[in-house]
């Protein structure tokens, strides 16, 4: 008889790897798990309830907020505040970081950075969306209010990161710096079950993911790499397959499983890149490196080594199978 291991059991088993955690990480993940279940329920009702479409406001990025963006942000914020182990969060949907003012939260060891609903514009057309999260140990003294410096830490200081993908099934994939594991939600019993242990990205792949509609705005090195992917060469299994959903979590998850590269370069429209370093690039870079992959912003510039200077800092992102990222890096180094 096959023994099913739940997310809660798995985290408790791994707690011995972090003797200083004293159960706080278990509690923190319990909050994330709860909010994910609530969001799973609401997303599955999209189209039946009045939760799709624009909310009528813009977020700090100047992007149209969807109703589910607002809903997801509130659910995760409330869940993380309840346990007392998190002293504050920073969200892609909020201009400033959020202090948790309760006395129990002042002693919290951790801060969480989150993109509550990545790809939310796809909800109306029933395309997979996701949540991305990142956990750091605070640098300010415990017992005091959280500060901006607690959030402006380089990615290599993350102690946990992950994403939840709401697709044909709902999955939670995470790392605490000791490999990557995936858990599929079973709504009949209300638990996440270990379904993808020790995830490893293939060293090479045949899928590239980029919005080619913006080709004219890309740097020359990226244009050359796209042409390389499209050329015919039996020895390298080219032409490669182009797959782009427009939801970072969905594109990343597919490439993690099958092997591939995701590209979001700088452009004439977005000279600093479009994705957010703290909410998207850092957690995905931590995950991919733990799965045997590679993530860079520019040639020789590892995502996890970038020192952030502001909460909503943007950054180019090239992430995926290491051999594909290395090849892209060659083109950018030569042509810019």
Curated annotation (Swiss-Prot):
Pathway: Carbohydrate biosynthesis; gluconeogenesis
InterPro entries: FBPase_C_dom, FBPase_class-1, FBPase_N, FBPtase, Fructose_bisphosphatase_AS
Main location class: cytoplasm
Needed cofactors: Mg(2+)
Residue numbers binding substrate: 118-121, 211, 244, 262-264, 274
Cellular component per GO, a single term: cytosol
Keywords linked to the UniProt accession: Carbohydrate metabolism, Cytoplasm, Hydrolase, Magnesium, Metal-binding
Residues the record lists as binding Mg(2+) 2: 115, 118, 280
UniProt-listed GO biological process terms: fructose 1,6-bisphosphate metabolic process; fructose 6-phosphate metabolic process; fructose metabolic process; gluconeogenesis; sucrose biosynthetic process
Gene Ontology molecular functions: fructose 1,6-bisphosphate 1-phosphatase activity; magnesium ion binding
Cofactor note: Binds 2 magnesium ions per subunit.
Pfam (any one): FBPase_C
Family matches, as Gene3D superfamilies: 3.40.190.80, Fructose-1,6-Bisphosphatase, subunit A, domain 1
Quaternary data: Homotetramer.
Protein family according to the UniProt entry: Belongs to the FBPase class 1 family.
Descriptive protein name: Fructose-1,6-bisphosphatase class 1
Gene (UniProt): fbp
């Amino acid at each position: 008889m096959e023994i099913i291991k739940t997310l809660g059991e798995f985290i408790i088993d791994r707690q011995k790897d972090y003797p200083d955690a004293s159960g706080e990480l278990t509690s923190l993940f319990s909050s994330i798990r709860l909010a994910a279940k609530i969001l799973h329920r609401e997303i599955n009702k999209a189209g039946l309830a009045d939760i799709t479409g624009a909310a009528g406001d813009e977020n700090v990025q100047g992007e149209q907020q969807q109703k589910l963006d607002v809903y997801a942000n509130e659910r995760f914020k409330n869940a993380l505040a309840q346990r007392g182990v998190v002293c504050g969060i920073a969200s892609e949907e909020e201009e400033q970081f959020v202090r948790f003012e309760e006395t129990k939260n002042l002693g919290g060891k951790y801060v969480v950075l989150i993109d509550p609903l990545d790809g939310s514009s796809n909800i109306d057309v029933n395309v997979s969306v996701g949540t991305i999260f990142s956990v750091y140990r605070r640098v300010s003294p415990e017992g005091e209010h959280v500060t901006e410096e607690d959030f402006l830490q380089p990615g290599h200081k993350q102690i946990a990161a992950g994403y939840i993908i709401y697709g044909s099934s709902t999955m939670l994939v995470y790392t605490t710096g000791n490999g990557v594991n995936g858990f599929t939600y079973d709504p009949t019993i209300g638990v996440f079950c270990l379904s993808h242990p020790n995830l490893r990205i293939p060293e090479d792949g045949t899928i590239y993911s980029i919005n080619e509609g913006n080709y004219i705005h890309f740097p020359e090195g990226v244009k050359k790499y796209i042409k390389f992917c499209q050329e015919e060469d039996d020895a390298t299994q080219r032409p490669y397959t182009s797959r782009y959903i427009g939801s970072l979590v969905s594109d990343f998850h597919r490439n993690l499983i099958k092997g591939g590269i995701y590209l979001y370069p700088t452009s004439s429209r977005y000279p600093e890149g479009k994705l957010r370093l703290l909410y998207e690039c850092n957690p995905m870079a931590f995950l991919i490196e733990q799965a045997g992959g590679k993530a860079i912003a520019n040639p020789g510039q590892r995502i996890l080594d970038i020192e952030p200077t502001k909460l909503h800092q943007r950054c180019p992102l090239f992430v995926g199978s290491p051999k594909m990222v290395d090849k892209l890096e060659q083109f950018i180094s030569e042509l810019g």
